[in-house]
């Protein structure tokens, strides 16, 4: 049931991830019709504190509910932790399989 709640909450948004050798970058897009519209710029980890910057950017958008912000930040945390702990040593295709609801591009 929790998975259904997550999908319902995130259905207005999607995460975009740049999967790089020395960094991972996360941005949020809003889903509009059958397309997407950029909502934030990319925030890079570990170059900057991507999670804190993303949190601050989402908090500026008062029309995003607290539940949606929490779900987006939780998902960003999962991606950053995966990249940090094991993912940076694996190709982007493996990350895409693990996080199938996220849009990935990368060179690593």
Swiss-Prot record:
Keyword Ribosomal protein in annotation: yes
Domain of life the protein comes from: Bacteria
InterPro entries given in the database record: PSRP-3/Ycf65_sf (IPR038447), Ribosomal_PSRP3/Ycf65 (IPR006924)
GO molecular function terms listed in the Swiss-Prot or TrEMBL record: structural constituent of ribosome
Subunit structure: Part of the 30S ribosomal subunit.
Alphabetized HAMAP family for the sequence: Ribosomal_plastid_cS23 (MF_00619)
Protein role: Probably a ribosomal protein or a ribosome-associated protein.
Protein's name in the database: Probable small ribosomal subunit protein cS23
Organism: Thermosynechococcus vestitus (strain NIES-2133 / IAM M-273 / BP-1)
């Amino acid at each position: 049931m929790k998975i259904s709640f997550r999908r319902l909450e995130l259905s207005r948004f999607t995460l975009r991830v740049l999967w790089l050798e020395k960094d991972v970058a996360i941005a949020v897009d809003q889903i509009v019709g059958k397309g997407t519209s950029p909502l934030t710029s990319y925030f890079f980890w570990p170059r900057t504190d991507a999670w804190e910057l993303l949190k601050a950017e989402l908090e500026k958008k008062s029309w995003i509910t607290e539940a949606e912000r929490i779900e987006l930040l939780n998902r960003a945390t999962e991606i950053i932790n995966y990249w940090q702990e094991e993912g940076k040593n694996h190709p982007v295709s493996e990350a895409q399989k693990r996080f199938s609801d996220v849009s990935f591009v990368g060179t690593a």
